[in-house]
Amino acid sequence: MATADTPAPASSGLSPKEEGELEDGEISDDDNNSQIRSRSSSSSSGGGLLPYPRRRPPHSARGGGSGGGGGSSSSSSSSQQQLRNFSRSRHASERGHLRGPSSYRPKEPFRSHPPSVRMPSSSLSESSPRPSFWERSHLALDRFRFRGRPYRGGSRWSRGRGVGERGGKPGCRPPLGGGAGSGFSSSQSWREPSPPRKSSKSFGRSPSRKQNYSSKNENCVEETFEDLLLKYKQIQLELECINKDEKLALSSKEENVQEDPKTLNFEDQTSTDNVSITKDSSKEVAPEEKTQVKTFQAFELKPLRQKLTLPGDKNRLKKVKDGAKPLSLKSDTTDSSQGLQDKEQNLTRRISTSDILSEKKLGEDEEELSELQLRLLALQSASKKWQQKEQQVMKESKEKLTKTKTVQQKVKTSTKTHSAKKVSTTAKQALRKQQTKAWKKLQQQKEQERQKEEDQRKQAEEEERRKREEEIRKIRDLSNQEEQYNRFMKLVGGKRRSRSKSSDPDLRRSLDKQPTDSGGGIYQYDNYEEVAMDTDSETSSPAPSPVQPPFFSECSLGYFSPAPSLSLPPPPQVSSLPPLSQPYVEGLCVSLEPLPPLPPLPPLPPEDPEQPPKPPFADEEEEEEMLLREELLKSLANKRAFKPEETSSNSDPPSPPVLNNSHPVPRSNLSIVSINTVSQPRIQNPKFHRGPRLPRTVISLPKHKSVVVTLNDSDDSESDGEASKSTNSVFGGLESMIKEARRTAEQASKPKVPPKSEKENDPLRTPEALPEEKKIEYRLLKEEIANREKQRLIKSDQLKTSSSSPANSDVEIDGIGRIAMVTKQVTDAESKLKKHRILLMKDESVLKNLVQQEAKKKESVRNAEAKITKLTEQLQATEKILNVNRMFLKKLQEQIHRVQQRVTIKKALTLKYGEELARAKAVASKEIGKRKLEQDRFGPNKMMRLDSSPVSSPRKHSAELIAMEKRRLQKLEYEYALKIQKLKEARALKAKEQQNISPVVEEEPEFSLPQPSLHDLTQDKLTLDTEENDVDDEILSGSSRERRRSFLESNYFTKPNLKHTDTANKECINKLNKNTVEKPELFLGLKIGELQKLYSKADSLKQLILKTTTGITEKVLHGQEISVDVDFVTAQSKTMEVKPCPFRPYHSPLLVFKSYRFSPYYRTKEKLPLSSVSYSNMIEPDQCFCRFDLTGTCNDDDCQWQHIQDYTLSRKQLFQDILSYNLSLIGCAETSTNEEITASAEKYVEKLFGVNKDRMSMDQMAVLLVSNINESKGHTPPFTTYKDKRKWKPKFWRKPISDNSFSSDEEQSTGPIKYAFQPENQINVPALDTVVTPDDVRYFTNETDDIANLEASVLENPSHVQLWLKLAYKYLNQNEGECSESLDSALNVLARALENNKDNPEIWCHYLRLFSKRGTKDEVQEMCETAVEYAPDYQSFWTFLHLESTFEEKDYVCERMLEFLMGAAKQETSNILSFQLLEALLFRVQLHIFTGRCQSALAILQNALKSANDGIVAEYLKTSDRCLAWLAYIHLIEFNILPSKFYDPSNDNPSRIVNTESFVMPWQAVQDVKTNPDMLLAVFEDAVKACTDESLAVEERIEACLPLYTNMIALHQLLERYEAAMELCKSLLESCPINCQLLEALVALYLQTNQHDKARAVWLTAFEKNPQNAEVFYHMCKFFILQNRGDNLLPFLRKFIASFFKPGFEKYNNLDLFRYLLNIPGPIDIPSRLCKGNFDDDMFNHQVPYLWLIYCLCHPLQSSIKETVEAYEAALGVAMRCDIVQKIWMDYLVFANNRAAGSRNKVQEFKFFTDLVNRCLVTVPARYPIPFSSADYWSNYEFHNRVIFFYLSCVPKTQHSKTLERFCSVMPANSGLALRLLQHEWEESNVQILKLQAKMFTYNIPTCLATWKIAIAAEIVLKGQREVHRLYQRALQKLPLCASLWKDQLLFEASEGGKTDNLRKLVSKCQEIGVSLNELLNLNSNKTESKNH
């Protein structure tokens, strides 16, 4: 602010910034102000504050007014525009100053004027021309528009005060521009902060208006106290300079005002506001304020205090007024006498004096225009006088047309009278001379006045400064910063500086920069608004005295002086303005002293009154003022439209801007000076302090309709002319403007031409921004333009005169008119071009600023969003930590509780054991040993006994110890609570390491325990991963509800409070010792080279595929290949999926029973009406009834089931149902639509019954219809029923099925089979309503379904296990709250259940599974120990087993489980116990094998079967189980693994036995036999011997050992020892002659040795011996058919069937007899007497399945293909054993294959065959229960694979790949099929596809080792080394204990040249989880050892 902004382009007279800011100010007005206005609706202070959406007219309004803070708006558009233009240039600073003193500078971006340079008020007035008339008019019009709105509050006062007063209510933020000062500030804000200003520190948000006070706060926030003081001093200096300038300006202005008494009269009224301010200030610093008048220092609110005019001042002003009135009268007289000439003369005087002045005054004028707006009030009353004067002037001008016309008057007249003729050359010269003289005179006057003012000001300021400096020194000496701040604020407040503009210019700058923020705030605090309003009459009050732009700045200062920091003394810079500002200021000063007259520029008495119209801003509040303005605008618009000459007058306005430019003072200096000046007035007028807004006595100003006349800037053609004159002499233009306003009022009816904002924004009006030289040049140009304008005006006057008086000739008028027209056009074009350019520049600068602001805002928004995101993340993290900490606290508390219990128990036990020890010493050492052994062996039982017996009287000592321990533990509890976080971190790290070391056994969802149905709560999958419990707690499931706390609050814990004895100490010790002993040594013996050798010997991909697929296809039944076109097969595969059912629908004989209604017996015997729902209904037979509807009411609107209302017939439907039996009766056909039939039925009924329809009941009508139907059909009773199915019948409307109607079906199906095709005719039935789930309750709530009820129930009946489980899972599945809370709630329930049922293994199993999700590994182990201690049960041991993760732990639990089972078996033996023993034994063996311990596995199994010890496991096994155990042993010897038949092929982890069927060893060749054959046979013999139960019959014994015998026979056969095999078979058949397995084995031996006759003889002999044995005959039939001897079967078939009948059956054929035996309905009825009764029901029931097989198998031999198909379909419809169904299907498929192969229409037959295969795969179950378990199932695809492989043999090889892929997609978990597909891809050399398929199978079947190995081998073949690492990692997660995988990875790493460290890490990981690699890496020794075995 130190230097004013350098003048902008000469055109605008403003720095581009300033222009932009001006424009911005306007924009700020428009945009920002609109925003701000909206914010501070009533804060229209300053134009900027004006709430109007777009008040561009006066920049001052925005920039100046608002900038003026206090007075700017009060001085209305003129002052505002002056301020705007003026402030744009150097007065941007003044504007800032104005803004500053009055209230505060709005942020720079929004300031329309340069913030930094605050010119003294005088300089302001000078430099900133008043807003153009049009601008002021526009503002006035805007105000008029918004007059009724709240922002009207921003009338002249609010304008003058800024938001401060009205608009500036503290609550409302001023427009962006800020408060009253916002205009300036906004302009400044738009500009870059003036350099002199130290970077104004923008406080975060725009200070509320109150920040006027807080402006200091702002400084304080951003600047140090020292800085504040320094800036404060600078401001004081600036204010002193401004005061001096003001004094000079005021003195000169007073003279000018005296010259214009009339104008002053009018101005006095209007400017009394401003003048009163100025006057008061002038009293204080009269000369200074006079100088201030020059610049119309709206901001220098110093005069605000003066605003309240004292009587003496008023007299003085009146005197001045009187002096001024003569001047104005004089000029008026001149105008009237000479018409335009008088005006020209006045203008000449004004132009010379006031043109210079007006140029200076243009600033003044513009600011005075604001005052003029106030004067509009005076205009109202004076308008009549002005009209009279105007008439006189017109007359005089007519008379003087011939005389020489003063250029000044002419210019002004021309401005107003656009028709005036061009002034002659002589007139121009005279005008110029007059102008020059007037200019010189004015300058002299100004100099004198300035000298006086400066002297006075200096004295006053010196005193003030001394006082301030003393005060400042005191303040600086204070040590307390707060006290310093308070004192400093007091000091500033005392000076009446608005805090927002604290003396610190930097602060002001910052305010300027933050117009919006600081502006708003300051204005809110601005109390000066009221003062400003009071001082509206004062010259200094900017808004009130629009004529005094200089005062405007000054007034605004004075006005806002209440704002301590805002009061600025007129800056000395004003002195630089004097030439320009003096004349103008003089006029202003004159107007200031005579408060009533607006301070017109020097000698414009008549026109000054016109300037008062500009004050409309002052009276903006009043509607009259607005109306007047509006009228004026109308007139101006009309004149603009109609008078082109007016445009030429626009050329003049620029001159005043030049004046303004000539004295631009550095913004900073100006602002500082103005601040200082203002501060003085404030000090003098304490009433203006911000604090309470003192009522302004001047508030009651005469209300005149304001006419906005922008002297300099008036853009309208008319206003421009006036503006030019006003520029030359501010008031000259006003006079003509006022006259125009009068005309406008008279022409109110004329259409309004809205003022153009462009002209308002014309920056050319502010020449103050120009340098001095250019300013002078500008003035000269202005004078020249004024002379021309005057000539033009004279001509126009002459035209007028000639038109009115005949003295003037038409020719002269025409010539002059033409010239005027041409000149006007040229001027118009030039002015338009200039204005548009200026507007363009302004808009560009505005755009630039807006873009910058947008970028800043975007950045701030981004930052805010980033902060929000960060905070949200922090919040979530904190919540997580909180939850985890809570959880750990609970765990610690539980641990402490447990440990306390253990401690007490152990102490008691210690006492007991001590006593026992003492007793034991007395016993012999042998006894002691025994006891020790007993303790070791039966520790747990002993402990349980101890536990059950209460502790006997513990001693006092132990009680004390317990108490001490308790205290210690409590202390520990507290410490633990503190260490929770650390513990958690440590545990998380440990868990992470453990995860890295040992992959999780199962990748299961974190926690999704399905609620088990109550009958099966043991199905839940066990989660073996106990290392991630902490995480699981938080991730449990998304659908957990906030759990109910009622039940839990009473005693919330997650572990049962069981008084259990110490866990088996001995067992734990044994376990530990065992683990340490068994831990293998680190494998470091082998070198990398050896490992690489082993890797090279490893199985290749081909070997792997061959190994895994051998045995899969060995016994596949091969069919005949059907050669069909490949394209068809491909298409067929698609159709096959769509249409699976080729057979026609089943016809039920019951479907015709509804026609019974047509029988006469229906009514006579049944006595039923035809409407009976039993017969007349719309029931859909394939649609379920709604069970809710059946048992109550169904409230589900979308229920898909049938309801009573759905199938009950209405009256119309009943008639339609009856008529549907003969549609032709009603004229319809079968093809008719429902609508047609319905309509026809209604017509028929209507026609039939007619009038009687309403007299008959429904049943009577129905009876008549029935008789009609019978007659039409020709039926005679009683034969009236219908056998044919109706083509149409009424059906109930089925609700549309929603998309998710089948979701429950899919959710419920847990099976892996998902068939790709959907049957075409499948009915979309909703989910079967099999089980009512807890969420399924619609209408009846089971009492136990509600949690509260369940809680009550379990408390009443605590031993009800199912209720406890149901409640626990209720809590677990709650949808509220967190998952961990739900889990804890469920655990709490189960813990309570265990307290009441601690011996219930079912509860323990559920509890352990849930507890494993939250407890640590140690905690879970401890709870498992507790479980098996309290509830030792097979299931609880299995749960324990699955929850352990390492080999040692699992092996230990398995060993204990075997001991437990053996102990139980000693007491009683049972099949289930025997199976459990076998399963536990084989699990342990499998665990050892899986972890690489084949030798130990073999030893375990061997010891279990034939140990020398008495108590071997085999003793407790049933014969069948013992036989399986021996088979497993032999299989292990031979293949180093257990039989795969026992286990689920898709899960290679150690698991439970799923299948106990016997099997044959999978030897393929002699080489496969590893063991010595004789030794192997000896083992078989041992096995048979061990499995033979002598108590059984021979046949039973053979059958029990049959699996062993069949394997012995197979071994003999493999070894090609056929004779031995045959001998064995025959010997066995002697005891079991009809054992089909043995018979088949013998036949196979004969066939292998090509003894077909003997083979046939075997079957024939067996059949002859057992003619009624259907099983034997079936096998015989199969044999004959396979031998292609089917034709030979018929006699045997007859013989076989005859065995069931007595003689007499001969007349019946075989099929009829079979139908009779199988109870198949047929055409012939066979008497029952012919059937033999020589077989009992049991035997016959055993035979029936084979009878069906024989019936189907032999059917093709005796009947057609169609009947054979029907026979197979009938057989499949009979409920039979699964194995029989499979045999029927295989026979059926073979039949279909043969049929298709031999058919001519292969395509159709193959389609039938394919559909049949699909049906078979779909209908045959693949889910089988695990032995002795009804809850656990496994998927057995063995039969499905046989069917698929058979189908493949019937399909061309080219289709195998697609077929296999399709079946794999249908059965994704079918491991056998997956391996077959991989084998096929390998055979086709599709390694890439093989790799992809294998990788897919690793996801579908994640626990199948074979697929992992093939996938890895494929990657190795394709060199995908990185993928190999990933596959190993994934595989070991699924199969963590698989030694084979670990070995492969180790060898792979070694082959890759892996580092030794990596290999050692692998080995150490293996050791950690208990995997042994020793045997796998020493395969030779393993082999020899196994052979030795």
UniProtKB/Swiss-Prot annotation:
Residues 266-279, 330-340, 647-671 have a biased composition (Polar residues). The modification N-acetylalanine is found at A2. Residues 20-32, 527-537 have a biased composition (Acidic residues). Residues 251-262, 280-290, 392-402, 444-479, 501-515, 755-770 have a biased composition (Basic and acidic residues). The modification Phosphoserine is found at residues 15, 28, 34, 128, 251, 352, 383, 662, 714, 717, 719, 805, 809, 948-949, 953, 998, 1046, 1301, 1303-1304. Residues 430-440 have a biased composition (Basic residues). Keywords: Acetylation, Coiled coil, Metal-binding, Nucleus, Phosphoprotein, Repeat, TPR repeat, Zinc, Zinc-finger. Residues 33-44, 114-132, 183-192, 201-210, 574-583 have a biased composition (Low complexity). TPR repeats lie at residues 1361-1400, 1401-1434, 1438-1471, 1478-1511, 1602-1635, 1636-1669, 1745-1778. The keyword Transmembrane does not apply. Residues 62-72 have a biased composition (Gly residues). Pfam families: zf-C3H1. It is found in: Nucleus. PANTHER family: ZINC FINGER C3H1 DOMAIN-CONTAINING PROTEIN. This is Zinc finger C3H1 domain-containing protein. It comes from Homo sapiens.
